[in-house]
Amino acid sequence: MQIFHNLNEWIRFRNTLSPDLSLGFAPTMGNLHAGHASLFLASSKENHYTVSSLFVNPTQFNNPDDYKHYPRTVDADLELMTQNGVDFCILPNENEIYTDGYAYQVQENRLGQLMEGKHRPGHFNGVLTIVMKLFNLVKPTRAYFGEKDYQQLLLIQGMVKALFMDIEIKSCPTVREKSGLACSSRNNRLTPSQREIADEFAKIFHQNKSSAMISKELEALGITVEYIEEFQGRRFAAVKIGDIRLIDNYLL
C-alpha cells in the first residue's frame, strides 16, 4: 500500500493514473474495525484500485470532547487497510484540507435537519463538506459507505445526485458483532459493564415492538434514549450509555 502524507503528492500521483482505470474510495476517520474492512473488500472486488483516507474531521463533531477523545490508531489502521485490499491511503492534515479556514461548507436543508441532524447541529454540514473535498481530491469511480450511518448514506447519495457528480455511491450492509451490536469505533470506549448494556440495546432495538415499547425497555436498563424513529421503511435509534453515544438502524 502506498501512503500519501501530502495532498500535493497525492494530486500529482492521481493525475498519472489512466482514466480507463476504476478507483473505489472508502473514506474513514481511523480507529478502524470489521465494518471498514468490509468496505475495502467490496471496493477491491469491483475496481482496479482502492483508495482510503485517514482524517479525523473536526467539523463534524458538535461536541469538542468527542473530537478530543476520538481514538487515533494510525499504525493499526494502516495494517488493517493493507490486509484488506487498500492500494493507496491519504493522510492529510487539517491545514491542507481546510485551506479556506472553514469558509465554504456544503449544507442540506431537509433530511439533514432530522434525527442525527436535529440532535447534532452542524454535524452533517461537516460530513458533506469533507466528503465533497475528498471526492474532488480522489475522483473515484465508486465510493463505499456503510449502512450503519444510513442517514449519512442518504445525504451523500443526494449530494452526488444534486450536484451532478459522476460517482457511483455503493452501500454496504452493517457489520455486527456476535451480540448483534453494530461495529463502531465508539464500542472501544465502553467499559465491560457498559458493553453488556450495549449488547442488550442491540437485542431490544431489533425486537418487533413499537418504538415506544422499545424506548421504555431501554430506559429501564438505564440507557438514555435520544430518539427512536421510523423513516422511509427503516427504524433509527440514537442512545447514550454513560457518555458513549451509539446509533443503529435496520430495515423494517
From Swiss-Prot:
<keyword id="KW-0547">Nucleotide-binding</keyword>
<dbReference type="GO" id="GO:0015940">
    <property type="term" value="P:pantothenate biosynthetic process"/>
</dbReference>
<protein>
    <recommendedName>
        <fullName>Pantothenate synthetase</fullName>
        <ecNumber>6.3.2.1</ecNumber>
    </recommendedName>
</protein>
<comment type="subunit">
    <text>Homodimer.</text>
</comment>
<comment type="pathway">
    <text>Cofactor biosynthesis; (R)-pantothenate biosynthesis; (R)-pantothenate from (R)-pantoate and beta-alanine: step 1/1.</text>
</comment>
<dbReference type="InterPro" id="IPR014729">
    <property type="entry name" value="Rossmann-like_a/b/a_fold"/>
</dbReference>
<feature type="binding site">
    <location>
        <position position="60"/>
    </location>
    <ligand>
        <name>(R)-pantoate</name>
    </ligand>
</feature>
<dbReference type="GO" id="GO:0005524">
    <property type="term" value="F:ATP binding"/>
</dbReference>
<keyword id="KW-0436">Ligase</keyword>
<feature type="binding site">
    <location>
        <begin position="146"/>
        <end position="149"/>
    </location>
    <ligand>
        <name>ATP</name>
    </ligand>
</feature>
<keyword id="KW-0566">Pantothenate biosynthesis</keyword>
<dbReference type="InterPro" id="IPR042176">
    <property type="entry name" value="Pantoate_ligase_C"/>
</dbReference>
<dbReference type="InterPro" id="IPR003721">
    <property type="entry name" value="Pantoate_ligase"/>
</dbReference>
<keyword id="KW-0963">Cytoplasm</keyword>
<feature type="binding site">
    <location>
        <begin position="29"/>
        <end position="36"/>
    </location>
    <ligand>
        <name>ATP</name>
    </ligand>
</feature>
<keyword id="KW-0067">ATP-binding</keyword>
<feature type="binding site">
    <location>
        <position position="60"/>
    </location>
    <ligand>
        <name>beta-alanine</name>
    </ligand>
</feature>
<dbReference type="GO" id="GO:0004592">
    <property type="term" value="F:pantoate-beta-alanine ligase activity"/>
</dbReference>
<dbReference type="GO" id="GO:0005829">
    <property type="term" value="C:cytosol"/>
</dbReference>
<feature type="active site" description="Proton donor">
    <location>
        <position position="36"/>
    </location>
</feature>
<comment type="similarity">
    <text>Belongs to the pantothenate synthetase family.</text>
</comment>
<comment type="function">
    <text>Catalyzes the condensation of pantoate with beta-alanine in an ATP-dependent reaction via a pantoyl-adenylate intermediate.</text>
</comment>
<feature type="binding site">
    <location>
        <begin position="183"/>
        <end position="186"/>
    </location>
    <ligand>
        <name>ATP</name>
    </ligand>
</feature>
<dbReference type="Pfam" id="PF02569">
    <property type="entry name" value="Pantoate_ligase"/>
</dbReference>
<feature type="binding site">
    <location>
        <position position="175"/>
    </location>
    <ligand>
        <name>ATP</name>
    </ligand>
</feature>
<feature type="binding site">
    <location>
        <position position="152"/>
    </location>
    <ligand>
        <name>(R)-pantoate</name>
    </ligand>
</feature>
